[in-house]
Amino acid sequence: MAHLKLDTLHVQRSPRGSRRSSPSSGRSSACSSGSISPVPIIPIISISHDGDESESESEIETEPVRLFQRRMSTKCTNNLAAIIKEGFLLKHTWSFQRWRRRYFRLKRNMLFYAKDEKCDVFDDIDLSDLCYFECGIKNVNHSFQIITPTRSLVLCAESRREMEDWLGGLKTATAPQRPRGDSFLIEQHDILSNHHHWYATSHARPTYCNVCRDALSGVTSHGLSCEVCKCKVHKRCAAKSIANCKWTTLASVGKDIIEQADGSIIMPHQWMEGNLPVSSMCAVCKKTCGSVLRLQDWRCLWCRATVHVACRPQMAVACPIGPAKLSVVPPTSVHSISTDDAWDVASPKGNFSPLLVFVNSKSGDNQGVKFLRRFKQLLNPAQVFDLISTGPSLGLRLFRHFEMFRILVCSGDGSVGWVLSEIDRFNMHKQCQVAVMPLGTGNDLARVLGWGSSCDDDTHLPQILERYESASTKMLDRWSIMVFEKAIPVPKTPKMSISTEQEAMLTGMVTSANHHLRFIVETNDTQTLISSTRNLCDTVDDLVCRISEHHKEDEQLAVKCDILRQKLNMLLDALQEEEIGAHSGDDLIATIRSLITRSIPVTPGSNAYLLNPNISIEKTEKDQINTKERRNSRSLRSSEKEALQCRANSVKRAIYNVVEHSEPGRPKRYQRKLSITPFEALKLPTTASGESTPCTSPLPIIPPINIISPTMETSRLTCISPLPDTRRDSVDENFFNSINLPAPRQFADSRRSSGVPEVIQEIEEGANGETVYRRSRMSLTGGANIDDAGNRLSPCSDGGENTPTERKVDFLRVPIHTGEPIVDPLCDYRPHEVFERTYYMTREMDKDKEKDKEKEKEKTAEIEEENDKCVEKLGSIPAEKLVHTCNLQVPGVVVTPNPQNVYSSASITIIDTDAQTTTEQSSSDDLGGEASDVLSAISNEECSVASEIFDKQDAGQTVGDIIQNMDASNFTHIDSPETSDETEAMPGESLMDDISSVLGHDITYALQDNTLTDDTTTLCSEHAGPPKPPRKKSLSALSRTQAHPRRRNSSPPRTARLARMDSDDNPQQFGFENIVFEIDNRCDDQKMREPPRYCSLAQFVEGNDIARQSFKQLMLEQHRGGDNDIESPEQQQAPTNKGAHLLATTSEDELSTQTAIKIEIHDIDATVRSINSSMKPNTILTTSTSPTKKSGHGQDISVVVRPPTPLRGDSIKPTVSLLPVSSGGAMAVSMTCSGMLGVRAMNASEIRRHSSHAPSLAVREFDKDKDRRHSGFNPNQLTLDPEHARFLSSSPAASRRISCGSLFKKKNKKIATKRSYGLFSVRFFVVAEPDFRLATLALIRPLIPLPNEALPNLQTLKGSKSSLFMGSTLFGFDHLASAERDKEERGGKDKDKTPTEEANRKLPIINPLVRLPNWPNLANGGGFISKCLLANADTLCAAVSPLMDPDETLLAGYHEKCVMNNYFGIGIDAKISLDFHNKREEHPEKCRSRARNYMWYGVLGSKQLLQKTCKNLEQRVQLECDGQRIPLPELQGIVILNIPSFMGGTNFWGSSTKKDDIFLPPSFDDRVLEVVAVFGSVQMAASRLINLQHHRIAQCQSVQINILGDEEIPIQVDGEAWLQPPGMIRILHKNRVQMLCRNRSLELSLKSWHEKQRQHSISIQRDASSTASEHANSTDEVISERECYVLLNFIEAVSSLVKWVKFLIISHPALQHDLYEVACRASEALESIHPQGKLLEGPSLRTKLVEVIDSSRQLYDDACTLLRDRGHSLILREDLETKLSAALANMEMELKKCSVQKCIDGKLRAYFNVLAPNEESDGRRKSRPFWVRLRSGSTAGQQVFKPPLTNTREAANNWSVNEVVTWLETMQLSEYVDSFLKNDIRGKELLTLGRRDLKDLGVVKVGHVKRILQAIKDLSEN
């Protein structure tokens, strides 16, 4: 029934069916479809008959079969089947060539379409026999055509991407069903199926269909062409074509496989019939083949050989593959696809370097489509991939099994980065080499690699492939862009809300306030400033009033509104300060003052009773001092501008805080970007269940600032900069809102930090329901509880009411023990930022201030009395105990043991200055009243070296213990928690990075910084501390704490002291890191009851990383055991001079006026022996070699040591005398002296570890005229507050463990002993005026080799740039380096630097312009201790082996955003790129040409010139190069270059015309980045024309950029731009990839070699074949007429030569007679070819002529030799000489026409060239142009020497036709040889050929004509 219906349908046709040919025509080849009927199987489909819906084609073709059937509903079918793709497309209609929008739905083997997606009736098309193709090369309208046996649809998509999606969907719909239906198998099926890939095209000549063999219709022969094999078909015949496209794998070769006897497979030819190129020549018969009349002859798809049908059997079986043989993957080599989706490859014989090609079809205005098709025609289609459709992964997976292959990326830089990222993913760096073909616009990488800026023509692609085959390899550095972004969460529960109208009004107010703030910061107009300021105040007042009306009961909101008023008041103050100098007394000042008066807050006054009366929000004296300092700044205007910017940001943030609190559901830009609020960080449990304390007040419970909550997101627990040894003096206040970072330098003051020990009031609910207020102090140091009066409490105090849980709360708070009532220590110096934070904690404190002062006085008097008693007790020590000790006059200085954070040995002492243990106190935390000192103790303290020297050490250790530790053989190292049996798991960090980073840090700017920071503790101590004292206020503890010199502070002195607990249970003694660990790991009561376990020490086993045998240090037992031990540190004090005034307290005012203290050390060994006489013998191991021997030279070293001071150190000049002495007990005396002084002395070398964030110490000679702040010294400078320690806790730069044992060897002891004479005899003079540099010298003196010391590394010390003492004005070693420099300058002034010297330059290399006054002053360089380490790196690093990868944990919290190959930009350049990207996405048709894109870039750059959207970028970002902060001028962008090409070919770094002594030459394979400043769009434009260099910033190996504020900043990487939110960006080296660079020298060499080989082969072929045109039509035996003419001339020449040679011999009998015999032999041979006067005929003549030619050539050679040898003595007649010369010349010409060849039968035959003899050369020369003659200096009257005319033109002018033919064949134009031979074209005619002449010769191809004319031009010019 179905067949009957089909036949019936076949009869029903359209009225236009008459135009249709017979349905069976052309279907004979389609019988393989399986159809029984001769007619096609046509399914029942429904087609619309609307007049405007009828289909049409672009050519006149027969109408497909039309079916008139009732349309049925397809709703059920559509709902059942799975939809592959659906959407709207434009359908081309027949009427008026219109497009109609239709909805298409694609399913398996079916396509449905209707007017709308909701229609129930869809037209359906069967896709079982489908053909689809694109409708154009460029595909401007993104159209494609679908052809089935019954339908033909032309569809158009909105974009090329959508069109390719539809084509891919059609491919999927028609692909056979497979078990694994992923995209890989679909793409694999497409590669291996050998199906044609059609596209519509036109042809310039008659073309014939390969299916029906008929001509394509139309004048232009419009039809379909396969983009791979160039098969031509009609559109109606496309579905009938067989799948015989170009082979891809061995399976596709099929029956054509040829296998040899040995089993190897030969690559056969793959023939395609007809449509041959013009002038195709048969490879067998060398005749023209192909036709324009019919489909005939064959061409190979691989080697491009063409043959006749008759000559094809004679063709060689094996295919040579063609000119690109080296790059082609033969299909016979690809056997199958293995299980890992890669080819199983059998490498072919010979050279083989497969080429994997990736083409971006969208690049270059879709020019990539042409290249994609061209590559598929030249190579194996399976090795060419479209990046748009398949991406790089498919090709890389298939090529995975190739040992080595090349990759060619035809696209821009973005696609190159895509491919390189996929190579990273597959880890294929070692097996592939990447080349780039420039398509599109972004081709900076291709330009640098030598491949040019564009490649638009695909006609020379074979030659281009040869260039890539001869390319060389270079390594390209690739850089990871690591990003850490700030979290932007949404509040969980909304607090309040306002109506929609009020919300709109609120938004408008905030926008208006921001607008006015921007005007205030940026404008320079006074009137605008006044109006903006007044409007801002009005807007803020209106905002506060409206919000307060709707939220009257919200007390916190009222506080925030008051804070907003305070911030506005501070902004007005800053405005007044800025303008008071230039506008004193004008309207602006008056306006601002009136606004200040009006803006005074109201709420704080009403709630003043809630606040601590000590807390003040008024401007303090220090603020005025800072203001005065800013006035004296050399960068006054920029500093004031920055201050104003900070104040404006503060006001802006306060506005956002108010809005956020009133409306938590606002947009994200109004929300503070905090992952968790500070108040939610930690809930202190007060009940057994661990729940938070009930609180009736809105005040939340504040956690201790030193404790990291386990609820804090770990993604934020990272340091601001993990880079080592980094200095940060200026961080914008809104960088991280939850972290108080250092303010800019103008506002950086230790009194302004929020990280202070704050007084909080804990509100608890008592047992009877009453409210209990408990006040506590939070601190980083301390472990005991205190009562309301500040007294120390025992664990069971508080009336016994405290439960264990409450004690746990007290433990978590870790309050400090104070000797005074609780008051705010920063009462007079707290700024408004701190006021905001401390408001909630202190608002209900109402202690009486006068009462606190009285208690303070009482406690001070009591302390002084106890100290006097201690001093008297010390004075009673027997003198026998200290017989030979030093004469000591020190107030309250004790002999302290090796502290817990000191690890010492015979060669090195490591001091952890970050460790804040119970036995170590910072330099000022005992001064409770000193605001700056207390803050420094809690945050990052900045102190001088002298304060470090005299730091107090609690519960000390004896000198013997120190010496024991020095000489102990069991050196240990800090065991990581994961390897220790006594510790719990810690976050995986180690101190190794600290030391390793310090050792690797460059100190090019050595000794330029002068501050050392004690940062948050991270190094855990191994010392368990002294025995537990009774839990009461200990006078001895107080005295130990206070009887200790401290650094003086400029603020008013306070006598209150803050002591620390010395309990064993105090977790602080084990370091802050362990507290963090314990808090994070104790979440229930059971864990809280467990005893804490801390990091122990483990033995270092050589050859291993960390030993597993952990144990405590031996000094514990030595310290505790024995009655002979020294009883207390007080008893270790030295006898004092009776005349000296000993102070019982350490009041700094008294210390500053104290008299000098003289310390004399005469006998070191005796001193050590007497000091340690009471200790156990086995604990003393001295280094003395001669105990009773005095110093060898008898000289002393006198050092004047001044106590530290925050004042400038240049007020009193130091007097230092260094007298070298030598003794064996150097180290002993060094440690003894330092121990008695409480000094942490260095034993030959000392490591003082400090945080990577800390500003560190360096020695610098300050200028008197400079302010201390501009010299980099500010004792109140801040770095990071303790809250930021949460980041440091997970930072490997702050907490890494180092294997100390790996640093020390036994040989180091000997070296240290030899070099440790620096403190043999030392006199310390402590005078009233302090200077910290001399104390520094006293410490590092053992490190300094004296000039007369014979050390092997002395030259290294003098020559190294990173030497500690070079360039220092303190140590006086500059003369060594200066002498060397002078010597080098005299010796090698004109010598260039060697590559080794360039390689030895230390990075980062920073532009000296950074030091100029117009750049901001920012202290750079590493710390003092790190520079000491670098100076002695040879000793320290002798046995160091890295314990881990330093980058493993450096990037905690970071993620890789992308990878940089070319350049990175932030600011204006990224903004321009982002705008261009948006423009291109919006209007792609406007950005399709390279010239238009350049215009768009110019327009967008000019727009930025006016708008300046990236103005003041230096205020929004911070730049660090290799860990060093770089000060930034006013700029709009920063560019980081990896290649010397930027945004379209600009050499933005600038080329150096001379040898650059500062920077290294830029290169993309040196692991170095170039950092450049962008000042504006004008500079970017000028850099294309001018070689700019002043904008260079630095060269470095890593870069970090901190984005401040809350706004996004445009960023671009390799031209791809986006908006980056605030956070941190790190650029680190990722890997290197092999890139192919163009090698022009190799190309020229190969070209010349190929030409020689070609000419040689052509000459051989020419000798083996006849050169005359007649030879092709006649046999070799017959002499032609022209040859006969040449033969007669030859006979005449031979006869003449024989005649005159014989006459010469006869005339001169003395000559050789053998020449006469040769002449006779030649005469006889000549007679033999014409016996009896008749020439021989037939083949014998050519055989006889061989003998004649040989004899005549011998006669010619012998005659020439004779005349050359005897010509000077031979006297000839004039006529004989002339005739003999003419005969020889004629003979030479005739011999050139002769050739002897060996024939097939083995006989030699002679042949003659029938061409005319060479004519005389044209001696005329074209006159040179006038300017050439003028430059050469020749004039008309001068005789100019003319060289011999042997140039190419003269040689070509003498060419014969044979040589012209050879010249044609070298240019691969052998098809014109016959034409040149027939027309007798010689060299002279060749040089005059024109375009018309070439056309007459048959050269009709335009390309051939141009090539010949260009070659002729080259011959003429050369």
Swiss-Prot record:
Domain of life, source organism: Eukaryota
Record SMART domains: C1, DAGKa, DAGKc, PH, SAM
Record carries keyword Cell wall biogenesis/degradation: no
Pfam families, per the entry: C1_1, DAGK_acc, DAGK_cat, DGKD_4H, PH, SAM_1
GO CC, alphabetical: cytoplasm; plasma membrane
Lineage: Eukaryota, Metazoa, Ecdysozoa, Arthropoda, Hexapoda
UniProt feature, compositional bias: Polar residues: 1177-1189
The EC number(s) this enzyme carries: 2.7.1.107
Composition bias, Basic and acidic residues: 1-10
Domain DAGKc: 350-486
Family statement drawn from the similarity comment of this UniProt entry: Belongs to the eukaryotic diacylglycerol kinase family.
Protein name from the UniProt record: Diacylglycerol kinase eta
